[in-house]
Amino acid sequence: MVSFDATEALAPYREGRGYGAILFDRERLRQADASLFSPQSWGDRARPVDAGGRGGAWFVDAPFGHSVLRQYLRGGMAARVSRDRYLWKGAGRTRSFAEFRLMRELIKRKLPVPRPLAACYLREGLGYRAALLMERLENVRSLAEHAQVAGRGAPWEATGQLIARFHRAGLDHADLNAHNILFDAGGHGWLIDFDRGVLRIPATRWRERNLKRLHRSLLKLRGNRSREDVDKDYARLHRAYELAWGRGY
């Protein structure tokens, strides 16, 4: 359950034959329009993000701070039908609005996530497109990068503790992989990409599903490292997770 937030503002808009709305943080943005979500409107202040993901993301140097713009794109077989359109099920169930509100709820629970700034959808017929604008985390490296460079020296224990903290708060992360776990220069961990994430009562089944997905991600990204080495690193992560979970954080 995500609570009501009085600092949210909603702005409807029309574009071509479609209509949509923008949900934004009025403490950070005085107003919002559709140009916020167009890389072309930012010109040379927007540059593509090339690490992980399916594309459709840009670093933006905005007047309100360094940001990341992400357009929601499909992967796998679904992308053959439509790369960027989703079935309309109501404004509150759009991918962008749901992720925006989930991130704000996680921040209220004092969890380390980037601050969402604005989310939009544009509905046309039975489908819609969506995008999300959020603050950019500076001077961070993903767990994937740490693993490739440092191997056994990567922050395995810190990663396990970080995940346990989010799980204790009830976050079921839909795509927990090594690209979505970041560490800043001070060694502080962050999670990103909460698309399709939900808050649940903590339970073993979905927690282990998250962890197994991360394990598969590490194996996929192992490069020249042996599976045995990756499994040993993951075992360190999992032990730290279990210890942190047992302590209640």
UniProtKB/Swiss-Prot annotation:
Bilayer topology annotation: Peripheral membrane protein
One function term, GO molecular function aspect: phosphotransferase activity, alcohol group as acceptor
Reactions mediated catalytically: an alpha-Kdo-(2->6)-lipid IVA + ATP = a 4-O-phospho-alpha-Kdo-(2->6)-lipid IVA + ADP + H(+)
Short name of any one Pfam family annotated for the protein: Kdo
Pathway(s) of this molecule: Bacterial outer membrane biogenesis; LPS core biosynthesis
SUPFAM superfamilies: Protein kinase-like (PK-like)
Cystine residue pairs: none
Keywords (A to Z) from UniProt: ATP-binding, Cell inner membrane, Cell membrane, Kinase, Lipopolysaccharide biosynthesis, Membrane, Nucleotide-binding, Transferase
Subcellular location: Cell inner membrane
EC number(s) given by UniProt: 2.7.1.166
Protein purpose: Catalyzes the ATP-dependent phosphorylation of the 3-deoxy-D-manno-octulosonic acid (Kdo) residue in Kdo-lipid IV(A) at the 4-OH position.
Protein name: 3-deoxy-D-manno-octulosonic acid kinase
Native organism: Xanthomonas axonopodis pv. citri (strain 306)
